[in-house]
Swiss-Prot record:
Name of the molecule in the record: Protein-glutamate methylesterase/protein-glutamine glutaminase 1
GO cellular component, one term: cytoplasm
Modified residues (4-aspartylphosphate): D53
Top-level taxonomy: Bacteria, Pseudomonadati, Pseudomonadota, Betaproteobacteria, Burkholderiales
Chain ranges of the CheB-type methylesterase domain: 145-334
Post-translational modification comment from the UniProt entry: Phosphorylated by CheA. Phosphorylation of the N-terminal regulatory domain activates the methylesterase activity.
Gene this protein is translated from: cheB1
Span of domain Response regulatory: 2-120
Domain remark from Swiss-Prot or TrEMBL: Contains a C-terminal catalytic domain, and an N-terminal region which modulates catalytic activity.
Species this chain originates from: Burkholderia lata (strain ATCC 17760 / DSM 23089 / LMG 22485 / NCIMB 9086 / R18194 / 383)
Length: 334
């Protein structure tokens, strides 16, 4: 893959160069030392993936990510910055603007076997699989049983944190439907993202744990690199299968499990994101007679997943982000 590096620290740039050089299939296409230069280079020489720092001159990595993803030639962006934990709120803002993931900057003396070098290369490989993926998982075929209350099932990827904050923040405090969210996010950030989202809404937001049951007025966030499913008993479980999918956790896997096992109504929502994950699952939900919503192009940070859903006819409604919370509140009262 062709890789762009955006970082104003020479030692950090050199550490990333050395890590990338260990993979003959990767090469550094260019290096930008500030956000403005990164935007210009992405337009002139689009790379396959950008390794974006957060704190830089002129404008920071969040603003650079936002401008790149809104441009005519958006690029896949991986946040690579020092001390991810201390910069968690910046990471979530960047992911809300369209970044796919985040990882600590590799250490210069790490060597080939160093943890930070291996983790960076693993993240780059994961993004490569995402870019190459044809998308989709197999449709489930078992009918859902009648009865029970509505479950709000939301899938999101790049740009998702900001979209989720907007929707959850727009729901009333007495919103009584259970919510389950599958966001493409590394398990290292899931707990922090749940806490961050919890501060954006009057509802309770926490990570989904094995054996949890969806609770009225509570939003549960998938929290591991495994897939989340609903079981026949109505509890949540994590599973490694299907192992081949590049999306972990997969929105399709969760949506399809609802068509098999959820006993009541489902309202499926597919938000901004790169690729096609969730489109086939949303189609399966609609074919079962459930209400389905996809975010529109104008308000999506990355119009990939909702576009795939629209192409398949999976969405009963295609809505701007600002209208989705109101639609959910109205549908949950029916």
């Amino acid at each position: 893959m062709n890789i762009g590096i955006v970082n104003d620290l020479p030692l950090a740039v050199e550490a990333m160069r050395r890590a990338i050089a260990r993979r003959p299939e990767h090469r550094v296409l260019w290096v930008a030392t500030d956000g403005a230069q990164a935007v210009e280079l992405c337009a002139a020489q689009p790379p396959d993936v950008v390794l974006m720092d957060l704190i830089m001159p002129k404008f920071d990595g969040i603003e650079a990510t936002r401008r790149i993803m809104r441009s005519e030639r958006p690029c896949a962006i991986l946040i690579v910055t020092s001390c991810i934990g201390a910069n968690a709120w910046r990471v979530f803002e960047a992911m809300g603007a369209g970044a796919l993931d985040a990882v600590d900057t590799p250490r210069l003396g790490d060597g080939a076997a160093g943890d930070t070098t291996k983790l960076l290369l693993a993240k780059i490989d994961q993004i490569g699989r995402l870019l190459d993926a044809p998308g989709g998982t197999r449709l489930a075929g078992t009918a859902a049983r009648a009865g029970g209350g509505p479950l709000i099932a939301i899938g999101a990827s790049a740009g998702g944190p900001g979209a989720l904050a907007s929707i959850l923040g727009g729901l009333p405090a007495d919103f009584s439907a259970p919510i389950v969210i599958v966001q493409h996010v590394d398990r290292a950030f899931a707990e922090g993202m749940a806490q961050w989202l919890d501060g954006q809404t009057p509802l309770a937001v926490r990570v989904a744990r094995e054996g949890d049951r969806p609770q009225p007025g509570v939003a549960l966030l998938a929290a591991t690199d495994d897939h989340l499913r609903i079981t026949r008993a109505g509890t949540l479980e994590y599973t490694r299968e299907p192992a081949a999918t590049p999306y972990r956790p997969s929105v399709d896997v969760f949506f399809n499990s609802l068509t098999e096992h959820w006993p009541g109504r489902v309202i499926g929502v597919l938000l901004t994101g790169m690729g096609r994950d969730g489109a086939i699952g949303l189609k399966a939900l609609r074919m079962k007679g459930y209400h389905t919503i996809a975010q529109d192009e104008a308000t999506s940070a990355v119009y990939g997943m909702p576009k795939a859903a629209a192409t398949l006819g999976a969405a009963r409604a295609i809505l701007p982000l600002g209208r989705i919370a109101g639609e959910l509140a109205a549908l949950a009262r029916i």
